[in-house]
């Protein structure tokens, strides 16, 4: 195929194979985490080796709430920065697509369940030290019809 036709075919395939989790007008949660220039590796390690492990293992006493939490975990995506921002910070993007109303999106209960009160405070302290003064920005969005 000539390059123009090949590009057109690949573009069409890409648009028709996109698999969105949320439906049109369904809520999504997008969180931007702003990380200090020298804390990217530390944040990445805490995030994937401690925070997300605790979140994945968390078990709620209420089976209905646990079902919501399980659905939320399946809808959760983390985008790691490919490079440093122009201001020498790093930005991680967390997406809940869809946002599951009633599910647990706070990390402290899962940290406390896995590591105990003191351990959770210690992990949370190290986690918090990684953020810039801007910390995190959270946005609720809705999928637009395309």
Where are these regions (language model features)?
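Intrinsically disordered, low-complexity terminal tails and linkers in eukaryotic proteins, enriched
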Residues: 21, 79-146
């Amino acid at each position: 195929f000539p390059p123009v036709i090949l590009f057109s075919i690949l573009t069409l395939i890409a648009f028709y194979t996109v698999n969105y989790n949320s439906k049109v007008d369904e809520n999504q949660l997008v969180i931007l985490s702003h990380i200090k220039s020298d804390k990217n590796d530390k944040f990445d390690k805490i995030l994937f080796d401690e925070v997300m492990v605790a979140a994945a293992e968390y078990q709620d006493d209420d089976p209905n709430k646990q079902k919501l939490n399980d659905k939320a975990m399946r809808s959760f995506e983390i985008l790691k920065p490919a490079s440093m921002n122009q201001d020498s910070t790093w930005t991680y993007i967390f997406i809940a697509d869809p946002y599951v109303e009633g599910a647990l999106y706070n990390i402290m209960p899962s940290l406390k369940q896995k590591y105990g009160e003191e351990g959770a405070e210690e992990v949370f302290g190290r986690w918090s030290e990684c953020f810039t003064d801007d910390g995190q920005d959270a946005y609720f969005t809705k999928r637009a019809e395309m």
